[in-house]
Amino acid sequence: MEAKLKWIIPAVVVVLALVATLDSAGAAPNDRVARGKYLVMVGGCNDCHTPLKMGPNGPEPDLARMLSGHPESLAMPAPPKLGEGPWGVAVAATLTAWSGPWGVSFPANLTPDPETGLGKWTEKEFIDTLRTGRHLGRGRQILPPMPWFNYGKMTEEDLKSVFAYLRSIPAIKNKVPQPIPPDAG
């Protein structure tokens, strides 16, 4: 019996060590989606990519349009001129339009809608976008207030989890406007 324990204990230790070193690439898809949901929530993605609506206690996320970006139906007037001084940014009440020295930017539709969201994006394009700060990893610059430079430091597995979660939510058709460049004059 004692001889068997000499072999069983090291075998169990080896198996546990192997299991502990596995990354979550082999994790079940539901585990990846759950991790992605957690990262989206703590990362504050809803703060800008989900429009606000007025609720009984003031502004609250419009979960019927969760992560669909700036509402297509909400035409924005020209942003106010802020002039010189420490105030350099104007924000729409929905938190889905931002104006500053870069011009006007609108948070993107992160839902899996194939026409207006991330539905046709590959996992690689999503990761490249967050790593490079360029649309689809090669296009136009991602503008403030999107903190791509912070999210781009996430692990590959975390970014894959975020993408998996975004692919799992309901697709919402919502064409977000293109950014508006700053005034030339």
Roles of regions detected by a PLM:
Residues 1-12:
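Bacterial N-terminal signal peptides that target proteins for export
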Residues 10-20:
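Bacterial N-terminal signal peptides
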Residues 23-41, 53-59, 78, 116:
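Electrostatic cytochrome c docking/interface patches
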Residues 36, 42-52, 126, 162, ...:
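The canonical Cys-X-X-Cys-His
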Residues 47-51, 138-143, 173-180:
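Surface-exposed patches in mature extracellular/periplasmic domains of secreted proteins
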Residues 54-128, 142-155, 184-185:
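Gly/Gly-Pro-rich "capping" loops immediately C-terminal to redox-active cysteine motifs
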Residues 120-136, 148-177:
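C-terminal capping alpha-helices of c-type cytochrome domains
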